[in-house]
């Protein structure tokens, strides 16, 4: 039976560390950290995600600023909202909830966010910082995956890692983080020929394919660590990931569950980016390695 890569347990630990830091530094800063989440439209999944983020903020003492715009909001008005949040001195982190409604191009809107307040780590400047190994906000889901690997004693150094998916949200930054940790990395995608031939070579397999239960036992090398980034609602009810967990858990050495794996750590890394930005703005003593073990 595979080791369970439990994101909930790790998320609680990191949240406790963040809460302790906030309580210690609150008087010196004069205000709590602030996270603004901008949601456009009425996508039900996005509404759930935003509610979860607001609850996480409340648990650790981060002020939450929510903006919800109608789905037919023109791009200029969304841009004005971002600029207002950029100028708000009580906001340390800004998240533009994706996906956006049709007609809104996420690229220019993400670029409009102040890079120092980019809580999701998706601004071009911060992706460049990641590429160069410089400090800055990190993409939340890949950063959460790296924390899960570390906390379970899985060192990517010298290992073969395969990332399925090449999105700027997960796949590309995930590959960069694994490479920075001295793994030999392959990115696979929808046009990859003979996918299983690549994935069966992986010591670490990160699946962000966006396809329900796409990866099965035939794709997994015995003893591999498998991280399932996907989350989907089944027609008959319940949730599943991109991995057929019942097949893979008997082969893999480690497997992240869905739900309860990557999802909680994605939210927690959003809080980490926000709190670290708050510390930097107020010159507060902090150590990222102490916050995320």
UniProtKB/Swiss-Prot annotation:
Enzyme Commission number(s): 1.5.1.5, 3.5.4.9
Keywords of this entry: Amino-acid biosynthesis, Histidine biosynthesis, Hydrolase, Methionine biosynthesis, Multifunctional enzyme, NADP, One-carbon metabolism, Oxidoreductase, Purine biosynthesis
Listed InterPro entries: Aminoacid_DH-like_N_sf, NAD(P)-bd_dom_sf, THF_DH/CycHdrlase, THF_DH/CycHdrlase_cat_dom, THF_DH/CycHdrlase_CS, THF_DH/CycHdrlase_NAD-bd_dom
GO biological process, one term: L-histidine biosynthetic process
Domain of life the protein comes from: Bacteria
A single MF term (Gene Ontology): methylenetetrahydrofolate dehydrogenase (NADP+) activity
One GO CC term on file: cytosol
Stored CDD domains: NAD_bind_m-THF_DH_Cyclohyd
Reaction equations catalysed: (6R)-5,10-methylene-5,6,7,8-tetrahydrofolate + NADP(+) = (6R)-5,10-methenyltetrahydrofolate + NADPH; (6R)-5,10-methenyltetrahydrofolate + H2O = (6R)-10-formyltetrahydrofolate + H(+)
SUPFAM superfamilies: Aminoacid dehydrogenase-like, N-terminal domain, NAD(P)-binding Rossmann-fold domains
Pathway: One-carbon metabolism; tetrahydrofolate interconversion
Sites where the protein binds NADP(+): 165-167, 190, 231
HAMAP family according to UniProt: THF_DHG_CYH
Homology family: Belongs to the tetrahydrofolate dehydrogenase/cyclohydrolase family.
Entry function: Catalyzes the oxidation of 5,10-methylenetetrahydrofolate to 5,10-methenyltetrahydrofolate and then the hydrolysis of 5,10-methenyltetrahydrofolate to 10-formyltetrahydrofolate.
Subunit structure: Homodimer.
PANTHER family linked: C-1-TETRAHYDROFOLATE SYNTHASE, CYTOPLASMIC (PTHR48099:SF5), C-1-TETRAHYDROFOLATE SYNTHASE, CYTOPLASMIC-RELATED (PTHR48099)
NCBIfam families documented for this protein: PRK14186.1 (NF010783)
Protein name: Bifunctional protein FolD
Origin species: Synechococcus sp. (strain CC9605)
Gene: folD
């Amino acid at each position: 039976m595979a080791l369970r890569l439990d994101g909930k347990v790790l998320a609680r630990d990191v949240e406790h560390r963040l809460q302790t830091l906030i309580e210690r530094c609150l008087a010196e800063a004069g205000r709590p950290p602030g996270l603004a989440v901008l949601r456009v439209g009425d996508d039900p999944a996005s509404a759930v995600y935003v509610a979860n983020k607001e609850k996480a903020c409340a648990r650790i003492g981060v002020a939450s600023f929510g903006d919800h715009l109608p789905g037919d909001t023109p791009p200029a008005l969304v841009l004005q909202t971002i600029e207002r949040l950029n100028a708000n001195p009580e906001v340390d982190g800004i998240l533009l909830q994706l996906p956006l409604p049709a007609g809104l191009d996420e690229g220019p809107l993400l670029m409009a966010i102040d890079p120092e307040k980019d809580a999701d780590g998706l601004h071009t400047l911060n992706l460049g910082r990641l590429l160069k190994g410089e400090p800055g906000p990190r993409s939340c889901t890949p950063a959460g995956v790296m924390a899960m690997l570390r906390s379970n004693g899985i060192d990517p150094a010298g290992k073969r890692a395969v990332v399925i998916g090449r999105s700027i949200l997960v796949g590309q930054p995930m590959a960069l983080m694994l490479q920075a940790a001295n793994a030999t990395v392959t990115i696979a995608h929808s046009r990859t020929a003979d996918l299983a031939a690549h994935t069966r070579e992986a010591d670490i397999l990160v699946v962000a394919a966006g396809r329900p239960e796409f990866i099965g036992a035939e794709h997994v090398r015995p003893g591999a660590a498998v991280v399932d980034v996907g989350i989907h609602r089944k027609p008959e009810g319940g949730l599943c990931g991109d991995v057929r967990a019942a097949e893979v858990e008997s082969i893999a050495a480690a497997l992240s569950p869905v739900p309860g794996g990557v999802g909680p750590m994605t939210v927690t890394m959003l809080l980490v980016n926000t709190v670290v930005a708050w510390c930097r703005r107020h010159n507060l003593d902090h150590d990222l390695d102490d916050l995320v073990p």
